[in-house]
Amino acid sequence: MAQDVLTDLTKVRNIGIMAHIDAGKTTTTERILFYTGINYKIGEVHDGAATMDWMAQEQERGITITSAATTCFWEGTQINIIDTPGHVDFTVEVERSLRVLDGAVAVFDGKEGVEPQSETVWRQADKYDVPRICFVNKMDKLGADFFFTVGTISDRLGAEPLVMQLPIGAENSFAGVVDLVHMRALTWRGEVQMGADYTVEEIPADLLDQANEYRAKLVERVAETDEALLEKYLGGEDLTPEEIKAAVRKLTINSELYPIFCGSAFKNKGVQPMLDAVIDYLPSPLDVKPMIGHKVGDESVEIIRKPDATEPFSALAFKVAAHPFFGKLTYVRVYSGVVAAGSQVVNSTKGKKERIGKLFQMHSNKENPVDEARAGHIYAMIGLKETTTGDTLSDSAQQVVLESMTFPEPVISVAIEPKTKGDQEKLGTAIQRLAEEDPTFQVELDQETGQTIIKGMGELHLDILVDRMKREYKVEANVGKPQVAYRETIRRAVLKEDYVHKKQTGGSGQYAKVQVSIEPLDTADGTFYEFVNAVTGGRVPREYIPSVDNGIQEAMQEGVVAGYPLVGIKASLIDGAAHDVDSSEMAFKIAGKMVLREAVRKAQPVLLEPVMAVEVRTPADYMGDVIGDLNSRRGQIESMEDVSGAKLVKASVPLSEMFGYVGDLRSKTQGRAVYSMQFSNYAEVPRNVADEIVKKVRGE
């Protein structure tokens, strides 16, 4: 690797490629790797040969599941690419990729425009304030419409698009693009050398008026941002390409607007100008805000880490992946300082020492060893034992904890039973490894049945995890039916509930008296439980108060309606009493547990279920059937709109009603409709449905 790229961070771009499933994201990444000289044969997704899709299931299903990190070079600049999945079950992968990126390329299907998952990923990028450029792909596709797609970016995403290119031709006759900055045409003729050569030409006469119109819009928009440019523009002078680029770069990095480019990655057209745009408009590590962390053990003390080799070392682990030879690869983004392979660092999140065995820069699943990791770059580390996703690694003398990531709770679970005793041991290893890799994959043991329960973000998510257990860990197991993660909550407050725990059996007994109030708590911000110590006058000794809290939390693991975990409760300890000899932490914990149960019974407990935001895109002929079917699944239709010759139906539907939906939708629409769904919120289960669930749980 060129030394100047390591030290000159203006020549580094850490980017993600983000999109809806099937918008052509992996193909676009493949073309980038081809033109930057890393891939000699282009891998096609539909051949199962794409380089970035390196897990066996990805190559079979043609969708990207794991964000592999890849390094390549273009025009003297190093581009580190994180490939992100476009399927909603894998939002955790998208979330953790965006957290460590400086910029992104949003890929859109030129026929479909903004699709449901494009919207989800866009919102996640907004959350982390990631600057973006847009690539309208598949311009060779039947029905492709560049201006329709640009319109959906504005209408559905509420973003300001800035057109930087115009397509030359469309569908089969798509031949290239008009570059509005330099006012020239770039054309790719035929398949010679896989699109590596393009011709710079005069703008075709039939496009000249349109090109002048959009060039004027571009110049006017950038002139508004700078007084010197505005003066020049109002004086009738044209702006130079360099002036336009500098102004667009500034606007893009501030996320004020989003430059739009177009092409067809599959047909090898338009990829190189998009790579130029990555360098011209997306930020280097020096252009983004410095990383803010906090002191270990004290979140109120802020510590800033700048992307500089002279700063103390700090890095964030954003992905853990199993590797066939090295055991475990930990992907990190280094935010400050330098660290050499073989060094000892501290996992400041967990307070554990770690030794970095080897360091690599990755090309998909191939490793390129390096001697040291430097600020602003992305690496894979070997040898870290304790580190998991979201942990901070830092210099042991100057520790810092960087802002971590938030992951959604799983909404679906299945029971899994190993077929033989040998499988039992292998299952344990498989589950441990997979849980290290994926924070949204959770495991628990059902105390009553002894079954292992695995939980995830959707049916596809669990399917793939089970598939990986079979392939990678050779576990043969029976998998049960998917189960919904119900919750329980309360609908009204109970102002006073007393409980006395008293036990006398010779010797010292047990005594604890508590009085609590409970009230419903809004869970919209992710707070599911709050404990308030409102005891006055030392009626409950201070050392026993955490025990009451622990007892209440333990009771919340099992609700009174059907035994599902309780959420949305604010509990206040308002009074109580202790005995000098017989009181203990255990006595107060038991009292806390029992008083909550009693109070919840009086607080109108109800069952909650996960509700999914469902979007169905269907030909108009099947609209009635699709809506009727969603209504029959207790769905609430939120909206219906026209999109590129089809209808888009948005609805909220309980997850329990969505099992097997893919097959039903296929048969109702002859395979012509597509849908996506993701978790939206928890809502109260209607009484008649709740009664059925309770009966089932009780085995009636």
From Swiss-Prot:
Identify the keywords attached in UniProt to this record, alphabetized.
Answer: Cytoplasm, Elongation factor, GTP-binding, Nucleotide-binding, Protein biosynthesis
- Keyword check for GTP-binding, yes or no: yes
Kindly list the places in or outside the cell where this protein is found, as annotated in its UniProt entry. Cytoplasm
| TM regions (residue ranges) | none
- Please name the InterPro entries in this protein's record: EFG_II (IPR041095), EFG_III (IPR009022), EFG_III/V (IPR035647), EFG_IV (IPR047872), EFG_V (IPR035649), EFG_V-like (IPR000640), EFTu-like_2 (IPR004161), G_TR_CS (IPR031157)
Does NAD appear among the keywords? no
- Any coiled-coil ranges, and where? none
Q: Which GO terms describe its molecular function?
A: GTP binding; GTPase activity; translation elongation factor activity
User: Which residues does the annotation say bind GTP?
Assistant: 19-26, 83-87, 137-140
Its GO CC terms are: cytoplasm
Residue ranges of every copy of the tr-type G domain listed in the record: 10-286
Q: Which SUPFAM superfamilies match?
A: EF-G C-terminal domain-like (SSF54980), P-loop containing nucleoside triphosphate hydrolases (SSF52540), Ribosomal protein S5 domain 2-like (SSF54211), Translation proteins (SSF50447)
Primary localization class, coarse = cytoplasm
One of its GO biological process terms is:
ribosome disassembly
The entry sums up its family as follows: Belongs to the TRAFAC class translation factor GTPase superfamily. Classic translation factor GTPase family. EF-G/EF-2 subfamily.
Q: What the protein does?
A: Catalyzes the GTP-dependent ribosomal translocation step during translation elongation. During this step, the ribosome changes from the pre-translocational (PRE) to the post-translocational (POST) state as the newly formed A-site-bound peptidyl-tRNA and P-site-bound deacylated tRNA move to the P and E sites, respectively. Catalyzes the coordinated movement of the two tRNA molecules, the mRNA and conformational changes in the ribosome.
User: What is the name attached to this protein's record?
Assistant: Elongation factor G
Q: Which organism is it from?
A: Kineococcus radiotolerans (strain ATCC BAA-149 / DSM 14245 / SRS30216)
Name of the encoding gene = fusA
